[in-house]
């Protein structure tokens, strides 16, 4: 009986505590998002192996495109679209070096999103050319992932490869 009573009082107290909590406000969330985006821009990854076109940046750009769209739509702020466009131009809209490696085409997700917005063919041509080359020259790499054997990375045998390349091909399909 005491346990039941104690449980009931505890549940009742938790309901009152939750009712007094103030939920996040939209302006507060946007302010935090802006701070994070600004921090990311001001603090680029220092390691040379993670340059503009490497997969960590590709993942960052995917989120930045979403933030850029929100910032422009709600605040008339195109800062983030401009930042992404500078990166694309600086790299001639090219994906990274390894043709078959899923990580190296991840940046194209944002380039294709920018193409969808601006309709500048320079933004899509390198990704389209890379894709056509891959279709015409299928990988002969193994499906067995072998540490240190780069040829086995051609077949996307690791789980996050599904985030890196397939969205590029799906977007490219929708755009062409």
Regions found by a protein language model. Give the residues of each.
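Bacterial Sec-dependent N-terminal signal peptides
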Residues: 1-21
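Low-complexity, Ser/Thr/Pro/Gly-enriched N-terminal "stalk/linker" regions
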Residues: 20-86, 121-133, 142
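Active-site lining segments of carbohydrate-active enzymes
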Residues: 36-48, 152-153, 164-175
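Acidic/His metal-coordination segments adjacent to aromatic residues that form catalytic metal sites
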Residues: 41-42, 85-93, 141-152
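Alpha-helical junction/boundary sensor with strong preference for TPR arrays
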Residues: 44-47, 95, 118, 138, ...
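Well-ordered alpha-helical segments within folded domains of soluble proteins
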Residues: 53-69, 100-116, 157-174
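Mid-chain, structured segments of secreted extracytoplasmic proteins
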Residues: 76-113
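Asp-box/WD-like beta-propeller blade repeats and closely related beta-sheet repeat scaffolds
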Residues: 124-163
